[in-house]
Design a protein with these regions (language model features):
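Noncatalytic modules at the cell exterior or secretory-pathway interfaces
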Residues: 105-127, 236-240, 246-261
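Short helix-loop boundary/capping segments
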Residues: 130-206, 211-212
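Short, low-complexity, Pro/Ser/Thr/Gly-rich segments in the mature regions of secreted, periplasmic
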Residues: 245-285
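N-terminal Sec/ER secretory leader and immediately downstream segment
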Residues: 15-107
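Structured domain cores in non-transmembrane regions
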Residues: 75-163
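Contiguous beta-strand segments within globular domains
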Residues: 43-67, 168-192, 255
């Protein structure tokens, strides 16, 4: 399991520049937006591929739209004043970053031809990236499972998960292709909630299941993820907001609601459940 998590958390690194011994690095790979060296950049081409996959699989979240999102990895990462650009050999295109640090990308053929990167003025390992796919009109403190399934598919296709380890291309191809990663029975794809989590409940009609603790906090509490493996994860500063979901379990329909109880709510999550509804805890995998 630790190997799977490490591979999942390293899936995007094949597109990030790695310095090779004895080979002078391409200056463009290290001196980037506003002079930032070794930036937390992503492949523009792969992110557009993710957008194309979103359109192809839009039926999974028919009323939702796609945005990308920046999240901190380190406690000292400054998330205000981020400058985001698409940068190629000769082209530089500013990207508008919303107040919630989400953004969209426009297709630019010149940027594609120049194999451009999407670059914020922050260093590698300081931030991570995710997709944000949200169906409007859901109850407060809920997400929709189909949206989150699609977030996984698009995020993997776009190469968003950040890491500092070098990864061979074969591992990336296995994760993103042949293994059909997001449809697995025990998918180690980390999601992030808005605030520190107390519990997560899956609800579909009268069926309700509370996620076990090993599916929260990157699985550290019950050994699903070792503390050593956290070095290969992109969740360091947001560990208390992380959770896994049974994405490949099709007994849960796409319209399943994911309900969040937060640490600062001060509510008893069991007390919010109607007595006539059976509640079970998902057993650790």
């Amino acid at each position: 399991m630790h190997v799977a998590i490490m591979l999942a958390c390293t899936a995007a690194c094949a597109d990030e520049p790695q310095e090779k011994p004895g080979v002078a690095p391409d200056p463009r790979e290290f001196i980037l937006v506003n002079g930032t060296r070794d930036p937390v950049n992503k492949s523009y081409r792969k992110m557009l591929n993710g957008m194309a996959l979103f359109e192809k699989m839009h039926g999974m979240a028919p009323n939702a739209s796609l945005r990308f999102k920046l999240l901190p990895r380190q406690r000292d990462t400054k998330m205000d004043g981020i400058v985001l650009e698409i940068v190629g050999d000769t082209v530089t295109i500013p990207v508008l970053l919303a107040a919630d640090r989400t953004f969209t990308l426009e297709r630019d053929q010149q940027a594609l031809d120049e194999n451009a990167s999407v670059m914020p003025n922050r260093k590698a390992s300081s931030m991570t990236w995710r997709t944000e796919i949200r169906t409007p009109g859901l109850p407060p403190n809920t997400r929709r499972l189909g949206d989150l399934r699609l977030e996984c598919h698009v995020g993997m296709e776009a190469g968003l998960i950040s890491n500092t380890l070098p990864v061979i291309g074969l591992a990336t191809n296995l994760i993103q292709g042949m293994l059909d990663f997001c449809n697995g029975s025990d998918v180690p794809y980390l999601f992030f909630s808005e605030r520190p989590l107390f519990s997560v409940t899956m609800a579909a009609g009268t069926r309700r299941e509370i996620l076990s603790v090993d599916e929260l906090y990157a699985g550290v509490s019950f050994g699903r993820t070792s503390k050593a493996d956290l070095a290969y994860c992109d969740c360091q500063v947001l560990l208390d907001r992380t959770y896994f979901l049974p994405l490949g379990d099709r007994s849960w329909p796409d319209d399943t609601l994911i309900e969040f109880e937060y640490m600062d709510d001060g509510n008893d999550p069991q007390g919010a459940v109607a007595p006539s509804v059976a509640v079970t805890n998902r057993a650790p995998q």
